[in-house]
């Protein structure tokens, strides 16, 4: 996570471990316009794992069972990372909206760079 980035949401998510037993591990998560950062402790003293939106393809497999919402983040190299959150926290929706906003901005920038900086797009009426 870059210093000075505006925080969209901060709180607890559970990530399924990659090992054979696949335990759910609680992580302190910080969502910004650029990434989702996962800290192993609540004090943010340990090194975080940062999932940059440029390396995320989509949020997939949203399923609600009991008090949890389960979802999967799919990376651009097709790695799947499983998460769950409490139903009322709506982490899956916040991550999805931030990812869509990031992807839309990237698409507009790509379009503008292909068209040249002098071309303007007319607003929809």
From Swiss-Prot:
- One GO biological process term: positive regulation of apoptotic process
**Keyword Membrane annotated:** yes
Any one GO molecular function term: phosphatidylinositol phosphate binding
Which InterPro entries does the record match to this protein?
PH-like_dom_sf, PH_domain, PHLA1/2/3
Q: Does the keyword Cytoplasm apply?
A: yes
Q: What does this protein do?
A: Plays a role in regulating placenta growth. May act via its PH domain that competes with other PH domain-containing proteins, thereby preventing their binding to membrane lipids.
Protein name as it appears in the record: Pleckstrin homology-like domain family A member 2
What organism is the protein native to? Xenopus laevis
Taxonomic lineage is: Eukaryota, Metazoa, Chordata, Craniata, Vertebrata
Encoding gene (name):
phlda2
């Amino acid at each position: 996570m870059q210093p000075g980035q505006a925080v969209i949401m901060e709180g607890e998510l559970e990530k399924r471990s990659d090992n054979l037993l696949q335990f759910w591990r609680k992580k302190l998560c910080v969502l910004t316009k650029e990434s989702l950062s996962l800290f192993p402790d609540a004090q943010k003293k340990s090194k975080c794992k940062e999932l940059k939106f440029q390396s995320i393809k989509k949020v997939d497999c949203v399923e609600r069972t009991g008090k949890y919402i389960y979802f999967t983040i799919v990376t651009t190299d097709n790695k799947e990372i499983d998460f769950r959150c409490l139903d009322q926290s709506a982490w899956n929706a916040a991550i999805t909206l931030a990812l869509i906003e990031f992807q839309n901005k990237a698409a507009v920038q790509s379009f503008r760079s292909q068209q040249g900086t002098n071309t303007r797009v007319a607003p929809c009426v």
